Amino acid sequence: MVRRLFRRTAVLFTFTMLLSGVSAVQAEQKPAAARPAPPAMSKEDMNAFLARPLIARIATVRANGSPQIVPMWFLYEDGVMYMSTRTYAAKVKHLQKNPRAAVVVDEMVAPTKNKVVTIEGTVEVLTTGVKETTTKIYHKYVGVEGSASPQAQQSINTPRVILKITPKKIETIDTTH
């Protein structure tokens, strides 16, 4: 419980800093020279990590400037992240006003062994190819059979848009070795 609360607080802090233009490194007290850089993933390892059915958290900026963080399913293809969401979701309104977003996908293997991919970028709200992309995302998380279920089909056929996140900056950490 405490670990989960700490993790959520750390994620919220990181997103708040990213969206406000202050990096987590700038927010720390230690000088950069005193901290070794955490080990990064190779591009191949990052692509394999993002191909797994993990949960992403996307942070958008509300009208009042505060962050909204939402867990989402995603698809990462050819260096671009795609998410499917309902047409009238709050995050869509936020992104139409301010297309900047931050996304994190992470996995805690053990208390000191983590894999993290953080993406900062701009988001386009797409209204074409929605059903096809949403179906691909569902295949990733519940398989072809699960995607054909009545519940999945109802969700897939709900009015939706695709969030196309084009990364401006990608950072990775892999402390599992």
Residue ranges of predicted features:
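Alpha-helix boundary recognition
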Residues: L50-A51, Q96-K97, I156-N157
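Short, conserved active-site entrance elements at the starts or edges of catalytic domains
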Residues: P31-T60
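Short, structured beta-strand-loop surface elements
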Residues: K30-A37, Y88-K140, V144
